[in-house]
């Protein structure tokens, strides 16, 4: 995946998100090891928005370290593209076997502060998010990254999170 080309395609699809795209592009220009999980002041992460096939439910995890409900995702391993990392994270963190990719293009972008944990100081996550679907009746499993992983009815999403970037994911589709 050529990230610059993917950002250009994303800009065409979501012209109202120019500010976040500009920040991503500036980060890519100014830094070398953008996918190294130890890179500071931040690094790119791969996330997945998983909705049920009938689009009535979304899959969220209660993140162990953050203590809040968010989409699944994580760090990009050496040699992986963001999309490959998204596939791996989706499988590892949900255990779902019915996963399918809806679109190879970027579905959403987000930039946020990640708190200091252990030896890693506070840093910035540049999330590249992809859209997946799965069978909403398939039972997900927890992973070491989560306290819980569960399907949530879309109309109840705000009972679990008030995070604007998660709400935006749901509003996109």
Regions flagged by a language model, labelled:
Residues 1-12:
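Generic N-terminal amphipathic, Lys/Arg-enriched alpha-helix
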Residues 11-47:
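Acidic, metal-coordinating catalytic segment for phosphate/diphosphate chemistry
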Residues 31, 40, 72, 110, ...:
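Glycine-rich, flexible loop/turn motifs
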Residues 36-71:
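N-terminal strand-loop-strand
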Residues 60-88:
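Aromatic- and glycine-enriched beta-alpha-beta binding-site module
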Residues 167-169:
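Cytochrome P450 catalytic domain signature, combining two hallmark sequence patches
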Residues 171-173:
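Compositionally biased, intrinsically disordered linkers/stalks adjacent to structured regions
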């Amino acid at each position: 995946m050529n990230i610059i080309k993917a950002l250009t395609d994303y800009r065409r699809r979501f012209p109202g998100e120019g500010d976040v795209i500009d920040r991503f592009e500036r980060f890519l220009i100014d830094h070398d090891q953008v996918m190294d999980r130890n890179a500071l002041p931040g690094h790119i992460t791969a996330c997945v928005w998983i909705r049920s096939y009938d689009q009535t439910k979304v899959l969220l995890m209660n993140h162990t370290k953050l203590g809040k409900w968010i989409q699944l995702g994580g760090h990009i391993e050496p040699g992986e593209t963001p999309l490959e990392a998204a596939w791996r994270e989706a499988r590892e963190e949900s255990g779902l076997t019915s996963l399918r990719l809806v679109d190879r293009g970027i579905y959403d972008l987000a930039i946020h502060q990640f708190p200091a944990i252990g030896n890693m100081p506070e840093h910035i996550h540049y999330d590249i998010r992809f859209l997946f679907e799965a069978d909403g009746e398939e039972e997900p499993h927890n992973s070491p990254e989560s306290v819980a992983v569960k399907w949530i009815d879309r109309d109840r999403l705000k009972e679990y999170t008030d995070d604007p970037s998660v709400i935006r994911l749901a509003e996109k589709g």
